[in-house]
Amino acid sequence: MTSKIMNKIQKKEKPNDVIYTPNSIVDLMLDFCDYKEGQSVLDPCKGKGAFFDKLSEPKDYCEITENIDFFDYTKKVDLIVGNPPYSILTKWLDHTMTICDKFCYVIGMYSLTPVRLQKMEENGFYITKILLTQVPTWFMRSYILVVEKGEKKPITFDYKNIGNKCLYCERPCGGMKNVGHCKRKATDTECSY
């Protein structure tokens, strides 16, 4: 199956769906979701491997540019961790809940809608941890969510200001006034300082 997102990537109609997650956010997410070696983990949109390369076996990935479509993936895994494409987030969450009992995603603050929360609860999934992040080189605040299937539990909430550092090289940058000294693009994975 060739998904619409692959067609958009090839035609560059929706370049905002291709944003590589910086290592500092990947490390933060893996720590925040209590990732343990030995868990079966899926990186649903591998990109250049920021998540995948830090995971131990058993691990698997999907990558639409390699014709490995997330929506065709049916194996059960212990954990899914990644940065999903926002333009199809509802469909993405629906499929996520069919193949795992726990997932950790970074999503834009305004993407956590009542409709999505209700749909998760209808499927027995609840947010167990939420981290609000302010990343100066991203255009909005983001949530790192840990969502688990099972009984509703109290939510752990925290806030982390990533600071005015380039996410790619850790050198100071001007945040939103000056998106970064390194002249990188959202699709770059390394600083070009």
Give the ranges of each region predicted by the language model:
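Class I S-adenosyl-L-methionine-dependent methyltransferase catalytic core
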Residues: 1-177, 181-188, 192-193
